[in-house]
Design a protein with these regions (language model features):
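Conserved active-site region of classical short-chain dehydrogenase/reductase
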Residues: 56, 79, 142
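Conserved beta-strand/loop positions that form the S-adenosyl-L-methionine
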Residues: 70-72
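Conserved SAM-binding loop of SAM-dependent methyltransferases across substrates and taxa
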Residues: 74-87
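Residue-level signal for inorganic ion chemistry
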Residues: 29, 81, 195
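Class I SAM-dependent transferase core
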Residues: 1-64, 68, 98-115
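Short conserved AdoMet
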Residues: 63, 85, 153
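S-adenosylmethionine
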Residues: 88-91, 95-200
Length: 200
């Protein structure tokens, strides 16, 4: 009931069924992570629950129905978004076969019909320009901006989850930091970089 405890200390209100599904995801993630090192094998169950809670706190910022999670790894935040809002179409982009196997298992085990899984590098994937791009632990922010520039990204909403406040000055991109509620609850630096193209 680790996620329930974290939610109790926050303003996040979610359905009991969704809460149960998040706990189920945590259990499966813990089991697989011990042998497959999906996130970091050294992370405790409590720390994995904190990662999930961090993703829960992203939800109020996602108004679009289409979400593209870049380099999703073990499904953070994409799986969490899929569990919490069945009306959103969530695309997970991940090149690693080991992690793809886990994502497919989660999708089948939890019946996530709103999930699309793509085994591709972000640099090669064809994207829906109307979807919100989200990234967490994908790469460092300046490198991310470089990749966005190379791909000529047209998405109007891009959110990068970060563990520190980062200031980026770019001639083509506006980057604004927003603190996450997870920062207060976890007592760790947590926030989002809201990235948008500057119209010339």
């Amino acid at each position: 009931m680790l996620i329930k405890k974290l939610l109790a200390n926050s303003s996040q209100e979610i359905d009991k069924i969704i809460e149960t599904n998040l706990e189920k995801y945590l259990e499966i993630l813990c089991k697989w992570n011990k042998t497959r090192n999906l996130v970091s094998r050294n992370l405790s169950k409590v720390e994995l629950a904190e990662h999930i809670f961090d993703c829960i706190c992203l939800m109020p910022f996602l108004n679009n129905k289409s979400i593209i999670d870049i380099g999703t790894g073990a499904g953070l935040p994409g799986i969490i978004i899929s569990i919490m809002d069945e009306n959103k179409e969530v695309v997970l982009v991940e090149p690693n076969q080991k992690k793809i196997s886990f994502l497919l298992h989660i999708q089948a085990e939890m019946g996530l019909k709103n999930l699309v899984i793509k085994k591709e590098k972000f640099e090669n994937v064809v994207l829906n320009s109307e979807g919100v791009l989200v990234a967490r632990a994908f790469t460092e922010p300046n490198k991310f901006i470089e990749i966005l520039e190379q791909k000529n990204i047209e998405n109007s909403e891009i959110i990068m989850m970060v563990s520190e406040e980062i200031k980026i000055i770019s001639p083509n991109w506006r980057v604004v930091y927003t603190a996450s509620e997870a920062e207060k609850v976890l007592e760790k630096k947590r926030g989002f970089l809201n990235i948008s193209r500057i119209e010339n």
